[in-house]
């Protein structure tokens, strides 16, 4: 596979910036229990190749933002090994947001799929040799 171009990397970054909150809420809702940051990062990675788009350190600002917005609760607990851990749990407001965002994502995905598939591609990309 050819190396990714700068504009593709930029596109992925912008796309993931908008979707990271949705994914993190979904992971916590599916877990049904509180999780600390590294656990959440491992769960995202376990979702498949898409998890590779997330850099582990990049989830922490999103978790803090979701917490500040009231979509997550958090608490800090001392750890037997290493620094204290911050545990996150989805709130009822977070579950409502997740439900709303899933609907918005479904609508957006259908719109984009329709735009990409409508009438087929008029120009095919031909990579240079």
Residue ranges: model-predicted function:
Residues 1-19:
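Intrinsically disordered, low-complexity serine/threonine- and proline-rich regulatory segments
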Residues 13-58:
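N-terminal helix-turn-helix DNA-binding core of bacterial DNA-binding proteins
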Residues 60-64:
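Short, hydrophobic-biased segments on the C-terminal half of alpha helices
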Residues 80, 84-102:
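Basic, amphipathic "hinge/linker" alpha-helix immediately C-terminal to the N-terminal HTH DNA-binding motif
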Residues 70:
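Glycine-centered, phosphate/nucleic-acid-interacting loop/turn motifs that mediate DNA/RNA or nucleotide
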Residues 96-129:
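Amphipathic alpha-helical dimerization/coiled-coil segments
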Residues 74:
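Short beta-strand "wing" residues that participate in macromolecule-binding interfaces
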């Amino acid at each position: 596979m050819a190396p990714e171009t700068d504009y593709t990397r930029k596109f992925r970054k912008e796309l993931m910036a908008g979707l990271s909150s949705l994914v993190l809420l979904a992971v916590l809702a599916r877990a049904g229990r509180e999780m600390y940051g590294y656990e959440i990062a491992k769960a995202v990675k376990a979702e498949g190749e898409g998890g590779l788009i997330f850099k582990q350190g990049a989830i922490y600002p999103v978790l803090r933002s979701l917490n500040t917005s009231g979509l997550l609760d958090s608490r800090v607990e001392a750890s037997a090994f290493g620094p204290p851990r911050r545990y996150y749990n989805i709130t009822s407001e977070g579950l409502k947001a997740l439900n709303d965002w899933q609907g918005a994502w479904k609508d957006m995905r259908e719109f984009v799929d329709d735009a990409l598939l409508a009438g087929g591609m008029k120009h095919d990309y031909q990579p240079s040799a």
